[in-house]
Amino acid sequence: MSAVAKRTRRARARAEEAARPGSTGEKYREMSVAEFFAKNKELAGFANPTRALYQTIRELVENSLDATDAKGILPWIHISIRQIEGSEGRGGRPRYTVTVEDNGIGVPVTSMAMAFGKVLFSSKYVIRQTRGMYGLGVKAAILYGQMTAGTPVEVYSATKGSQYVYMMKLVIDVQRNEPRILERGEWNKRGSWHGTRVTLSLEGDWSRAKSKILEYIKRTAVIAPYAEIILETPDGEIYYFPRSTRKLPKPPRESKPHPHGVDIEQLKSMLRSTRASTLREFLVKEFQSIGDKTAQDFLEKYGLDPDLKPRELLKKGRDKLLRRLADALMEYPFRAPKSDYLSPIGSDIIEIGLRRMFNPEWVGAVSRSPKAYRGHPFIVEVGIAYGGGIEARSEPLLLRYANKIPLLYEEREDVSYKVVSSINWRQYNVDFPAPLVVLVHIASTKVPYKGVGKESVSDVPEIEAEIRNAVQEVARRLRLYLSRKAREEEAIRRSVTLAKYIPEVAVSLAYFLRPPSKWQPPKPEEVKKIQEALIKIVARHIELPPVDGKTEDPEAIVRRIVESVELE
């Protein structure tokens, strides 16, 4: 028997032995990623029909926004939710067809099947700020639809500059984690449309999910007032959120990893894929915040050979040297990560969104300077709106966002809630119940979510401190506004006390400004002349503080009061 045949026979024997129950009677087998998430759908936010319908809308809308504003395109997003009549699922639960269409960059036809049919296949596995992180969301929705409605996902897409519109109907092969295409087509593009339209069916509960879905869309419109969003509901309602600004945040850019954010496994992967011929070249080419001089100083400090070939660190017997390099990268005081890769919303856009949605009497926002945690850059932005159309509540209405995603669930688990609820708002002249809205946005190449459902952010000390500083910074401006407003109201109250007597005093003076022998009812023009003089005298003695940069005319206030008295 040849050596090859012997090896094949031994391999077959090992495979048969592995498939047989062991001494414990247990069988072992491999589970694909798709099968794992199909069996543990609650991990991705699909715990029940209510949450599943909400999560499906959220995942598709986030993909649309990433494909538009992140590429400098003013977003147009159309969402349709329709109940499928006579197709109740398990337990009589209704089924729905969800369609989301956008005007984004589209998906290349060569990637369409994998992008929608393979779990953890994504364009987001780079160091860049995106709404999605795991390459899971839309595939989790497709899996849930397969399991509850038994229908494929239908995708139409056209990229910018393409002459064709492509269509695919596919399902995910759960055992193999591969797309199975059921139908495909392509058509000549008649217009200039580019973007993606995704349609899938699933079990859901619209009556329970409605409030969350509407709130999600409203909060998306707050954070993205540059987007035009249309929502058609199963109730026959159409919600339209027009674009209120054409100003877009700057698109995010891909960045190199920072040395403080790299672990041993990531370092191994980088060493395998690098084209650098020396360790010094590897450090300069593959990391941010490392130039030639920094690389030389770093290698000298830790006694590492600058001419060592990177792949030498992956050979047997080099484990200690590899760990030494990884520890040194974490320890050395490199420059902070660059933040120009991030895409903050900007204080102007935050204020536009809050004004449009809440019509407040005062609004302020701040976009803080970049900071970093564990080698990952982040920017905290905060907006506060007060009064006007805001309903008074026993605590602030908190709007949480991470990489422009509205976070609606798990509020009390979030670091933003921890900070906002711990602030003594009375120090800022806010007494509850009060009409107060606080918006917190965290932009980062790696948001520290508490789970794959992306609903709450961990209380990382650096992020917590920045949120607190940002909230307090805007709250101080609110306090200044409220203090000036209180002084103005007090001045107006005093003005009312004086001004309401002006008509009566004017008539009396008209009598007494002539000798007693000529007393007679004064003429209206005489009273009017004296009244005008009194209005100017009283107005000169009223000092109104500027409120939100504006000062009301004291004379106009006195005149309004006098006119109201005359009408009584």
Swiss-Prot record:
It comes from the Archaea. Its EC number is 5.6.2.2. ATP binds at residues 63, 102, 123-124, 132-139, 454. Residues 1-12 have a biased composition (Basic residues). GO terms for molecular function: ATP binding; DNA binding; DNA topoisomerase type II (double strand cut, ATP-hydrolyzing) activity. Gene3D superfamilies: 1.10.8.50, 3.30.230.10, Histidine kinase-like ATPase, C-terminal domain (3.30.565.10). Residues 1-26 are annotated as: Disordered. SUPFAM superfamilies: ATPase domain of HSP90 chaperone/DNA topoisomerase II/histidine kinase, Ribosomal protein S5 domain 2-like, S13-like H2TH domain. Keywords: ATP-binding, DNA-binding, Isomerase, Nucleotide-binding, Topoisomerase. GO terms for biological process: DNA topological change. The keyword ATP-binding applies. InterPro entries: HATPase_C_sf (IPR036890), Ribosomal_Su5_D2-typ_SF (IPR020568), Ribosomal_uS13-like_H2TH (IPR010979), Ribsml_uS5_D2-typ_fold_subgr (IPR014721), TopoVI_B (IPR005734), TopoVI_B_transducer (IPR015320). Signal peptide: none annotated. It catalyses: ATP-dependent breakage, passage and rejoining of double-stranded DNA. Homodimer. Heterotetramer of two Top6A and two Top6B chains. Belongs to the TOP6B family. Relaxes both positive and negative superturns and exhibits a strong decatenase activity. This is Type 2 DNA topoisomerase 6 subunit B. The gene is top6B.
